[in-house]
Amino acid sequence: MKGDRLIVALDTPSQEQALEWVDSLPQVLWWKVGLELFTAAGSSILQALKERGKRIFLDLKLHDIPHTVGRATEVAVGYGVDLLTVHAAGGSAMLRSAVAAAQGSSCRLLAVTLLTSISPPQVRQELGIEMDPADYVLHLARLAQAQGFTGLVCSPQEVSRLRQALGPEVLLVTPGIRLGQAKAGDGDEDQQRICTPDEALRAGADYLVVGRPITASPDPVAALRRFQALWDAAS
């Protein structure tokens, strides 16, 4: 498995627990810090990861008025993170504000299209969007690309279409990765649009984001090896 293409999500409010996972899986280069951990630990978790030589995906899904998102982006890239998420649904002005704030930094902005926790029926029934989910994702992806975004977060089910439509230069980061034992909506499974690592890679994903299937496993090292086997099979 290419360790620089796997991003492990630190889904915990505890910095101590997060760093225990990081230290127990030294072969993993990329780590995702989301709202839960960032709200609990603040920038100290980012500093701890940088001290360990890790690369950081700060997944805050910024979505506010353009001025606020621009200022928040400026602060976030100042932490030295490598990837930062912004909601594409915030509109063109908001997206441009984020791009302007990140200009000159080494941070790459990723536009979030449609959360992988949202099922196709919810798109119409709850969001009121009279589009096929795949069409809606492509619409938001093109909107973000037109404002200067060069990376996207999308479900594995949309990777192939986005790759074909947007070309090889767009960075596609894919959550909703499972080993196959979890079904959408089962138990504490939030993700609705999921697939296995080999399926996502064959579809054209650049990075895979995996959280609980590794960190909540009784043996995270063994779980990582299982992902490695599927990854190698897709290579």
From Swiss-Prot:
Residues at the catalytic site: 61 (proton donor)
EC annotation from Swiss-Prot or TrEMBL: 4.1.1.23
Reactions catalysed: orotidine 5'-phosphate + H(+) = UMP + CO2
Residues that coordinate or bind substrate: 11, 32, 59-68, 116, 178, 191, 211-212
Keyword field: Decarboxylase, Lyase, Pyrimidine biosynthesis
CC terms in the record's Gene Ontology section: cytosol
Pfam families associated with the record: OMPdecase (PF00215)
Gene Ontology molecular function: orotidine-5'-phosphate decarboxylase activity
Record pathway: Pyrimidine metabolism; UMP biosynthesis via de novo pathway; UMP from orotate: step 2/2
Matches recorded under SMART domains: OMPdecase (SM00934)
GO annotation (BP), single: 'de novo' UMP biosynthetic process
Taxonomy, superkingdom: Bacteria
Binding partners and assembly: Homodimer.
Family membership noted in the UniProt record: Belongs to the OMP decarboxylase family. Type 1 subfamily.
Known role: Catalyzes the decarboxylation of orotidine 5'-monophosphate (OMP) to uridine 5'-monophosphate (UMP).
PANTHER family tied to this protein: OROTIDINE 5'-PHOSPHATE DECARBOXYLASE (PTHR32119:SF2)
Protein name: Orotidine 5'-phosphate decarboxylase
The species this protein was found in: Synechococcus sp. (strain JA-2-3B'a(2-13)) (Cyanobacteria bacterium Yellowstone B-Prime)
Lineage, highest ranks first: Bacteria, Bacillati, Cyanobacteriota, Cyanophyceae, Synechococcales
